[in-house]
Amino acid sequence: MSEGDVARARAALAAFGTGDLDRLVRLFHPDFVGVVPPELSAEPDTYRGHAGIRRYVESFREYVDGLRFVPEDVIDAGDAVVVAMRIEGRGRGSGVPFEQRLANHITVRDGLIDSMTAYATIDEALAA
């Protein structure tokens, strides 16, 4: 990955928590595929295209206040970018804070995020 691709991955993760879906969607390829596996979510799913990005963010907003995606380590993994990160927020109804740590394996095509797959550990994401 180029430095520009690493910067795009950082920008995309930062944009998730801004609430600006139009800005976020512009960072993703129209053929984007995102995967959230069952071990990381009560509602695992595959998100496709710009509509998938919107659906993913809106599903969080329905239940979470103060949503933040916080990159902790960004690694140029050759043909991908791997980002160790945490997701933070508070339950909308309960106010209970939560934090989830994970690692994303991200690919870039034509200067846009093409795929993003979540893994439980950075080692799993690096091996993908």
Model segments located where?
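C-terminal and inter-domain tail/linker signature
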Residues: 1-128
